[in-house]
Amino acid sequence: MDVDSRMTTESDSDSDAAAQGGGGGGFGSETSSASPSAPGTPTAMGAGGGAAPIAAAAIAAAASAAVVAGPRPAPGYTVVNAAMEKKEDGPGCRCGHTLTAVPAVGEEGAPGYVGPRLILFGGATALEGNSATPPSSAGSAGIRLAGATADVHCYDVSSNKWSRLTPVGEPPSPRAAHVATAVGTMVVIQGGIGPAGLSAEDLHVLDLTQQRPRWHRVVVQGPGPGPRYGHVMALVGQRFLLTIGGNDGKRPLADVWALDTAAKPYEWRKLEPEGEGPPPCMYATASARSDGLLLLCGGRDANSVPLASAYGLAKHRDGRWEWAIAPGVSPSPRYQHAAVFVNARLHVSGGALGGGRMVEDSSSVAVLDTAAGVWCDTKSVVTTPRTGRYSADAAGGDASVELTRRCRHAAAAVGDMIYVYGGLRGGVLLDDLLVAEDLAAAETTNAANQAAAIAAASDIQAGREPGRYAYNDEQTGQPATITSPDGAVVLGTPVAAPVNGDMYTDISPENAVIQGQRRMSKGVDYLVEASAAEAEAISATLAAVKARQVNGEAEHSPDREQSPDATPSVKQNASLIKPDYALSNNSTPPPGVRLHHRAVVVAAETGGALGGMVRQLSIDQFENEGRRVIYGTPESATAARKLLDRQMSINSVPKKVIASLLKPRGWKPPVRRQFFLDCNEIADLCDSAERIFSSEPSVLQLKAPIKIFGDLHGQFGDLMRLFDEYGAPSTAGDIAYIDYLFLGDYVDRGQHSLETITLLLALKVEYPLNVHLIRGNHEAADINALFGFRIECIERMGERDGIWTWHRMNRLFNWLPLAALIEKKIICMHGGIGRSINHVEQIENLQRPITMEAGSVVLMDLLWSDPTENDSVEGLRPNARGPGLVTFGPDRVMEFCNNNDLQLIVRAHECVMDGFERFAQGHLITLFSATNYCGTANNAGAILVLGRDLVVVPKLIHPLPPAITSPETSPEHHLEDTWMQELNANRPPTPTRGRPQAANNDRGSLAWI
């Protein structure tokens, strides 16, 4: 193999005719020339669908922000005086190394917490020839490969301290000009060149999850990119490792290789991207934006000419990858530079031009602002390439840019801070650590939110055309908590602190709404009809479960749906040993969890003197505890994940959804029923949420304070009312100091299932540690095919798009966690414990993704069972929902709490008239958050607010009277209302608890249990 024993420091043969700045235009597949836009006219970056695939309004918003305020220039750097215990802890002088940011491990303040770190690996520590003289040609001094290292150094950002790591395991060989990227808390190393020539193509992983770091060599099947150096690598979409270009010892390359980290066995796949990509080159940089867009910047081509253009690479939903030229005019060509994203801004530093020359002065630091579609240097927006050098003493000159005049250095970002280490300047190796802060990061985020909101409105009005795709059916696979001294959880004493409007308290009798005297409306007769359709839907699934049990299949090893990218949740060892602490069957909840003696209620009136009034009612006024309403299970006809054209915009889908829908006070039902997201965006949102859900356990471990929500069933207006009255999950609301837990049944029955589920998923992606979702019985294809969600998807998105969306959502539902433990004292689930669940470990052992028909009786009981009519009915009884389902008595509740050292079960699943209902002497609470369920129940909706002191406060809203004029009176809405009414008439919910049951429901028979 023709490999030099050294790498020249700059260009092997230079040319003064450096490539000029990259062209403008939209960031899409139709951009094929480098002609710039009019000077100062920014364009936003998207991908995969033409010059301007994202909404024009969003582009205009970004451009407007750029014109009014102007994108911030590139920041200046300062030297960091880092500490180290001994000299060898510091990396020292070196170049050709890598610097990789690794996120924090654990919760800050908790034992074992490790803050964000920078991991420096390898590089060369010496030069060939006379290091005092800068090299000028191919025959002059270069990196001395005998001085290449395999050292690992760690910079702790929080403590500002360097240390040298000594990992166990088999380390990579010494090397420089290699690549590295982070995959979670692991650093992946590949390629490079060392004393023995080109390094092998093996992937080496430095695992930092344990206290003692460890090297692993990843086993990869089949052919790969082969040995090379001067190439680039990045993790795209938190999934695909992409390796591009470099030099194989003979020539520069332009090939693209991908490794799917979610598919085992691992294998490299050579990609053939469409569109105009970069020429064969080496010493470029590649950085991945958070939404999955990769930007390749600069480099040196086969003629040793430095390149100026930047290229974006994106993956379409149909599996295609596509190159597109980034907009804007680069201030300078460069190679052997460093680049890293901070939000939507790509920070580029240093670089060489060849012939001993480096990028200097204002152009030595540059930013590609992908929100505005422009390049900036330290002076201003760049409209023409900088051909000359700024004088250090000229007006506005900044001598600090001399710090960044270097090449062969490395950069990484932690939050809004950009770090640069080492490199080469004038033939001298550097050992300094630099830092800069991107002050524009917050502004970019705000601009993105604003643009997203405008884009959402534009989409609704214009009706965006979905991307190309096809589908087919395929079976796929926190803060410290203050508790009471004895550590117990408590159901109620002092009044919890008011939230938002709660300070307007009115407890006068004339304003109180007495729940026990509520009159039965016409809807009662309608609700009394047994829901035969729901019984049929669930009975088939239950029969399949029983058949498997008869055939001897283990309940704790349910069949799971599998997909190429499915990662099963970890199965924990079951321990069915009872804890020492036990509750007696006749006990009341011990000091610990307490139900507050007053519930907070919002007046039902929409206006007038009582409009929006909040008052508190005694819990004793909610004594009618036998009034629940019911409804409907699943064959999982899920579609294979199809890859649709994706728009690469910094206005990420979650931000767009939140900006469009999270309007607690101002949301109104859309006049047009067409949903504002297309399939591309639905797929993006589901992909992001699925990555989070798949990493969570089946039983979440949560901390107080927390708000708990019951069934929502597509009643998005009620969700907004609850957010308006009792706080919303946003930075302007209370997300910073209280978590949110939703107990399932997000879709079906109501008219806005799409709004409900997409907002909750967006909130989960935006606040993954603060917003928690578990699965309900309607999060299953068999059920939501019958009770509204499927027909809503088709009605609002068209048949093809709607069916695809319905399939994709149901595939996501199979990943949802199944229960949540709060402070190890309260367990939250959707249905109940039924006949089979005696220990929490049984739920923990359910592996996901899981479908209802592949699940066990444990899953059926968890999602479908109910408490008996009242505390006097013990044991197990048939359930009116359908054959094979059960209700469980207060003795089962007490036994379960005894077995698991728990004090309270919070569950949803049943429409209770007051929004919440106590059972088993207060050891179980049923929670329902949608009001006037199915338009007939006239029930209140409620949430539970659990404080740090473990006091539970119910907070209620009542049904609103119908508005006199609203968008709902439009002809389009009349059609929508007709199909929803017909659906509910054909598939009525189960009657309220305590009301007359259908004659054919033999609730006394135990023969089939």
Swiss-Prot record:
The active site is at H778 (proton donor). Disulfide bonds: none annotated. Binds 2 manganese ions per subunit. Coiled coil: none annotated. SMART domains: PP2Ac (SM00156). Residues 29-45 have a biased composition (Low complexity). Keywords: Hydrolase, Kelch repeat, Manganese, Metal-binding, Nucleus, Protein phosphatase, Repeat. GO terms for cellular component: nucleus. It is an enzyme of class 3 (hydrolase). It catalyses: O-phospho-L-seryl-[protein] + H2O = L-seryl-[protein] + phosphate; O-phospho-L-threonyl-[protein] + H2O = L-threonyl-[protein] + phosphate. The keyword Repeat applies. Mn(2+) 1 binds at D711, H713, D745. Gene3D superfamilies: 3.60.21.10, Kelch-type beta propeller (2.120.10.80). The keyword Hydrolase applies. Its cofactor is Mn(2+). GO terms for biological process: brassinosteroid mediated signaling pathway. It holds the Pfam family Kelch_1. Kelch repeats lie at residues 136-182, 240-288, 293-344, 349-396, 417-463. GO terms for molecular function: metal ion binding; protein serine/threonine phosphatase activity. Residues 1-48, 549-572, 984-1009 are annotated as: Disordered. Its main location: nucleus. PANTHER family: SERINE/THREONINE-PROTEIN PHOSPHATASE BSL3 (PTHR46422), SERINE_THREONINE-PROTEIN PHOSPHATASE BSL2 HOMOLOG (PTHR46422:SF13). Belongs to the PPP phosphatase family. BSU subfamily. This is Serine/threonine-protein phosphatase BSL2 homolog. It comes from Oryza sativa subsp. japonica (Rice). The gene is BSL2.
